[in-house]
């Protein structure tokens, strides 16, 4: 349709949103997004999308795009050396890159077991 702009919204699983919010609240954590969702959207637009799920106040930044997710996260961490406690959550296996800081989502969404694992990682000193 001429003059109509459409925007494909990613699928959100309500339980996953609740578990991510619980992780952020329990561990006083922030979200830095490295998903492909960030590639054509500003941080402000992403925060608006996250606001639909009560997560906007936790989304604080996005990584730059290098085409390599693990590299993007490493570069972000190098740029913020004050970040000591972090967890990388992804469906891709990045355990080799992030060892004791990684939770792999094997189901369709971040679930309760993932939440427990992420909380344990963030509470380690």
Annotate each language-model stretch with its function:
Residues 2-9:
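Short, small-residue-biased leader/transition segments that mark boundaries at the very start
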Residues 3, 34-38, 76-77, 86:
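Tryptophan-centric aromatic hotspots in well-structured domains and transmembrane helices
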Residues 17-20, 43, 47:
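A general structural signal for well-ordered alpha-helical packing
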Residues 44-125:
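C-terminal cap/substrate-recognition subdomain and adjoining C-terminal extension
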Residues 17-27, 74-82:
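Short, basic/hydrophobic alpha-helical segments
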Residues 8, 36, 90-92:
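Short loop/turn segments at strand-loop or loop-helix junctions that form parts
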Residues 10-14, 18:
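Nucleic-acid-processing active sites and adjacent nucleic-acid-binding tracks
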Residues 27-46:
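Substrate-recognition element of Asp-dependent hydrolases with the DxDx(T/V) motif
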């Amino acid at each position: 349709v001429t003059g109509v702009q459409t925007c494909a919204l990613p699928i959100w699983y309500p339980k996953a949103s609740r578990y991510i919010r619980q992780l952020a609240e329990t561990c006083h954590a922030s979200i830095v997004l490295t998903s492909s969702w960030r590639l054509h959207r500003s941080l402000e637009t992403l925060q608006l999308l996250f606001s639909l799920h009560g997560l906007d106040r936790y989304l604080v930044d996005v990584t730059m795009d290098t085409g390599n997710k693990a590299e993007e996260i490493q570069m972000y961490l190098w740029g913020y050396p004050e970040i000591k406690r972090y967890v990388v959550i992804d469906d891709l296996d990045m355990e080799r890159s992030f060892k004791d800081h990684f939770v792999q989502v094997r189901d369709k969404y971040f679930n309760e077991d993932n939440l427990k694992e992420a909380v344990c990682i963030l509470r380690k000193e």
